[in-house]
């Protein structure tokens, strides 16, 4: 029975995969910001201090001071690198097993640390807000990001 529920969750997550055109929109917009790793993480932490507090190496520290450290840049690179891997795999159904492996591993890591779904949703909202402030945002791009993130987060939530 558990397998059936899991299979249904995964099927729902990929029920509307991105088309090649939608994936191209997502990749194009991501290419404009993906080298701003520190700025992206700073933006997310500034908007969500509760997320920053979940990282022992950053908890209780001044964000403005942290922003200029190598430790912050390294962690920002890991987070943005993960998003970059997922974005690169979108839009091609042959890439679904690779996406699922990445997402499953990330979900397991965060589940073990007790990260709630609400914080993932905060992260998502802040990431989208950052994108909207940095790229030429329109309805088509917004719809593509929404669908892509829905797919990723639905799959991730099935593993939390």
Swiss-Prot record:
Coiled coil: none annotated. Belongs to the globin family. GO terms for molecular function: heme binding; metal ion binding; oxygen binding; oxygen carrier activity. Gene3D superfamilies: Globins. One of its GO terms (cellular component) is extracellular region. Keywords: Heme, Iron, Metal-binding, Oxygen transport, Signal, Transport. The keyword rRNA-binding does not apply. It comes from the Eukaryota. Residues 1-15 form the signal peptide. This is Globin CTT-II beta. Residues 17-160 form the Globin domain. SUPFAM superfamilies: Globin-like. It comes from Chironomus thummi thummi. Heme b binds at residues 75, 110. Homodimer. There are at least 12 different components in Midge globin. Pfam families: Globin.
